[in-house]
Design a protein with these regions (language model features):
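Catalytic metal-binding/acid-base residues of hydrolase active sites
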Residues: 37, 95, 182, 224-227
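Structured beta-strand-rich core segments of catalytic domains in phosphoester-bond hydrolases
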Residues: 94-182
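Metal-dependent phosphoester-hydrolase catalytic domains
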Residues: 22-23, 204, 208-218, 226-343
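Metal-dependent phosphoester/phosphodiester hydrolase catalytic core
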Residues: 47, 169-200, 204
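N-terminal, active-site-proximal structural segment of metallo-dependent hydrolase catalytic domains
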Residues: 19-109, 113, 117-129, 306-314, ...
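Second-shell loop/turn segments in exported
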Residues: 55-64, 85-91, 118-119, 150-152, ...
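Bacterial Sec-dependent N-terminal signal peptides
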Residues: 1-26
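Extracytoplasmic/secreted cell-surface and envelope-processing proteins
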Residues: 41, 98-101, 125-128, 185-188, ...
Length: 343
C-alpha cells in the first residue's frame, strides 16, 4: 500500500507540477497551511478540556489512533511537498509540543529535518497553531506568541497568533503569521466581533512591520473561520483581492478568486468555501528575488470522500460524527510556491 502511494505521488508531481526549467526559475520555496483537525496526544492536560480525546473518552482515542493520525498528516505533507518537502508548514489544531516532536521525527518526515515554532496557547481545548520549517531553507531569527485579550470580555480565551521571522536562501527576510481565528460556534454573526478584533490585532502587527519597511515580505496564513469577503479579513485586516498595480505595503488575499468560484478548502452544508487562506504583502508579488503568483488548494483524491448528503465530494475526516473512519481532516491544505532568483 505504501509503495503504491509513493508511485502515485511521484506520477502526480511529474505530470501536474511545472518544472523549474519551464518556469525559468532557479528554485522553488513551498509554503503550506493545513488545519489537521484535532491532532491530540493521549496525555491528560489538567489545564485544558481535552477529555474528548483521551483513552476512555467519548471518542475512544488511544495511542494507536494517535500514531495513525500522525502518519496521515505525514502522508499529506509528503504528497504535497514531493521529494524536498515544503520549506514552511503552518499547522492548526495541534494539542502539544509532544505532537510536534512525534510528527517531525516520524519516518515519513524525518529526512526533511523539520524544526518547529510553537507556544502553548490559552485555548480552552488546548489546540494551538505551529510552524514547521526546514533550517536549511529558513533561518529562524525570531518567534513570538501574539496574545489576544478581548477588551469587552477579558475572561474569553482564544488561541494566540504565532509570529515568526527568518531569512530565506536569497537573503530576503520573511515575516510569517500563523493564525487560527475564533470559531463560528454560536453563529457566524454572533461570533463575528471576535474574529474582527483578532484581525485588528493582526493588522496592527503588520502595519508596524510595514511602517519600518514598506517593502517587507509578509505571509499570513491559517484557518480564519471567515471567508475572504468577510469584514474581519476585508476591512479589519485590509486584505484585498489581487488587482494590479500592486502596492508593496498592501496585503493581498490569494483566496478571493478560489472562494468566488465556489471552490475552497472546507465544505459546510454542501458548499465549498475558503476558510483556509494565504495572504501576502505586495512586495512578494513584485520582488525580483523572492516572489509568488498564486495559491492553490491541495485536493488530491485520497483526501476526499463521497458526500452522501449533498453529493459531490467532501474532505475525508478522521471521524464522521462519532464514527472513526481513519481519514485525514475536515480541511484541505492550501499552499503557495515561491520562486527564487539570484541577481
Amino acid at each position: 500500500m505504501n509503495r503504491l502511494f509513493c508511485i502515485i505521488t511521484f506520477i502526480y508531481f511529474i505530470v501536474c507540477e511545472p518544472t523549474f526549467s519551464q518556469q525559468n526559475q532557479t528554485a522553488s520555496f513551498k509554503i503550506m497551511s493545513y488545519n489537521v483537525e484535532n491532532y491530540f496526544d493521549v496525555v491528560d492536560d489538567s489545564l485544558t478540556n481535552d477529555s474528548e480525546y483521551l483513552p476512555g473518552g467519548m471518542r475512544g482515542w488511544n495511542y494507536e489512533k494517535y500514531i495513525f493520525k500522525q502518519a496521515q498528516i505525514s502522508k499529506v505533507i509528503a504528497a504535497l511537498g514531493a521529494w524536498e518537502g515544503p520549506a514552511l508548514i503552518g499547522l492548526c489544531e495541534v494539542e502539544s509540543e509532544k505532537c510536534l516532536k512525534y510528527l517531525t521525527n516520524y519516518a515519513g518526515l524525518k529526512s526533511f529535518k523539520y524544526k518547529y515554532a510553537h507556544f502553548e496557547s490559552p485555548d480552552a481545548r488546548g489546540i494551538d497553531v505551529a510552524l514547521l520549517y526546514q533550517p536549511l531553507a529558513f533561518k529562524l531569527i525570531h518567534k513570538e506568541a501574539v496574545s489576544i485579550h478581548f477588551p469587552d470580555n477579558p475572561t474569553i480565551k482564544t488561541r494566540d497568533l504565532l509570529y515568526v521571522m527568518g531569512k530565506v536562501p536569497t537573503g530576503d527576510t520573511l515575516h510569517v503569521f500563523m493564525c487560527h481565528f475564533p470559531s463560528r460556534l454560536g453563529g457566524a454573526l454572533e461570533s463575528a466581533h471576535k474574529r474582527n478584533y483578532v484581525a485588528s490585532v493582526l493588522h496592527t502587527k503588520t502595519d508596524s512591520i510595514l511602517g519600518r519597511n514598506n517593502k517587507a515580505n509578509i505571509v499570513i496564513m491559517g484557518d480564519f473561520n471567515d471567508y475572504p469577503t468577510d469584514a474581519s479579513l476585508q476591512k479589519a485586516l485590509g486584505a484585498k483581492r489581487l488587482e494590479k498595480p500592486y502596492a508593496s505595503n498592501q496585503l493581498y488575499n490569494f483566496m478571493y478568486s478560489i472562494h468566488e468560484s465556489n471552490k475552497g478548502s472546507h465544505k459546510h452544508d454542501g458548499s465549498w468555501g475558503a476558510l483556509d487562506q494565504i495572504i501576502v504583502s505586495g512586495n512578494l508579488l513584485t520582488s525580483k528575488t523572492f516572489y509568488c503568483h498564486e495559491a492553490k488548494v491541495f485536493d488530491a483524491e485520497f483526501l476526499l470522500e463521497n458526500d452522501l448528503k449533498f453529493l459531490g465530494k467532501q474532505p475525508f475526516r478522521t471521524y464522521n460524527g462519532m464514527k472513526y473512519q481513519k481519514g485525514f481532516s475536515d480541511h484541505l491544505p492550501v499552499y503557495v510556491d515561491f520562486f527564487m532568483k539570484d541577481l
